[in-house]
């Protein structure tokens, strides 16, 4: 059984724009799968359809054999609990402490009123501190999140997903706004948790070299369709030219070396 399955998935926006065209993919447990393509190719739409931040028009998406497309109410909340999300712009409560932001990964496990009052059990705080230690910012736990650098804020996001105890992490252009050194640190963190914890990573990346260096599998989208799906080691410049519909520009190759 695949961890994530896209079955005949299509997305058409109200204005008639086709975001996804008949996508069929199987993502296996423990993969580090990178989605690449031009802006507007459907990368974010595909990624965000997994946890239903974007609903699809037709087809079905399964998480560990269960349809998240048809899930509602408590069943949907429980499925989303197993899917962590990392955003390009961090999606943190800037004025809250680092620890409080990481603890928000536990929200799906408790009644809303307890979360509003900040009544997290001791066990959750231990999980949060462990997550911060794993991404090397435990010493920042009591600082306001907006006092940290962009790379450190993205590590808070990763720690939040770890605290959520997700088996799947979706990352939507997580290093697009970071400098090369910080990019390497964040990507190394993601690879480490993928390899050490067996967490499945499905990530959108803009830079070709990053995709080849960190991905075990590359999925190329062009105009909402999958035009390449294979090992990162076999993704040549010609393959990327096919995905992008043109020769790759130098600023699209930027890696972390």
Swiss-Prot record:
It catalyses: phosphonate(out) + ATP + H2O = phosphonate(in) + ADP + phosphate + H(+). It is a peripheral membrane protein. InterPro entries: AAA+_ATPase, ABC_transporter-like_ATP-bd, ABC_transporter-like_CS, ABC_transpr_PhnC, MetN_ABC_transporter-like, P-loop_NTPase. It comes from the Bacteria. Residues 4-248 form the ABC transporter domain. Keywords: ATP-binding, Cell membrane, Membrane, Nucleotide-binding, Phosphonate transport, Translocase, Transport. ATP binds at residues 37-44. Its EC number is 7.3.2.2. PROSITE patterns: ABC_TRANSPORTER_1, ABC_TRANSPORTER_2, PHNC. One of its GO terms (molecular function) is ATP binding. Its main location: membrane. It is found in: Cell membrane. GO terms for cellular component: plasma membrane. Belongs to the ABC transporter superfamily. Phosphonates importer (TC 3.A.1.9.1) family. Part of the ABC transporter complex PhnCDE involved in phosphonates import. Responsible for energy coupling to the transport system. The complex is composed of two ATP-binding proteins (PhnC), two transmembrane proteins (PhnE) and a solute-binding protein (PhnD). This is Phosphonates import ATP-binding protein PhnC. It comes from Staphylococcus aureus (strain NCTC 8325 / PS 47).
